[in-house]
Amino acid sequence: PIEGAKAEVIEYNPGFTPDNKYVEIMDIVKSVTDTVDIMDAKILVSGGRGVGEEGFGMLKELAEVLGGEVSCSRAVVDNGWQPRDIQVGQTGKTVRPNVYFAIGISGAIQHVAGMEDSDLIVAINKDEDAPIFDVADYGIVGDLNKIVPALTEKLRAVVK
């Protein structure tokens, strides 16, 4: 404050009246989802870019056989193949399931940060040098389009 300075107070009314709420509700949208929160899942079958858009059908089938849920990497969400609410990783969710299947996931550090505390990690990738194998308890190197259906059928025979 400047000593001795004076200011004029001007009252201004923008036209508001107490009886008007000044808000118009245009629409009410309730968010409903059919998915389970992947953070609560005991078994996750997670797919990456290597699965491709059409490959998520076989992942869903494997998850159903195991009583698990499907999740994915950021690359999958960025490509618009799966919704963001099932994304695992630094920019997704951190999960700690009993079993985590990393299928077609290279193992970028951002993804690993969201799943490395899983009790058991099974990785399936065609690249034997993929970083995901560094954190996996079990690794299968090969064509996921052949391995996943075969694994699903074998598990279907023993899991009732």
Question: Can you describe what each PLM-predicted range is?
Answer:
Residues P1-K160:
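N-terminal glycine-rich FAD/FM-binding segment characteristic of electron-transfer flavoproteins
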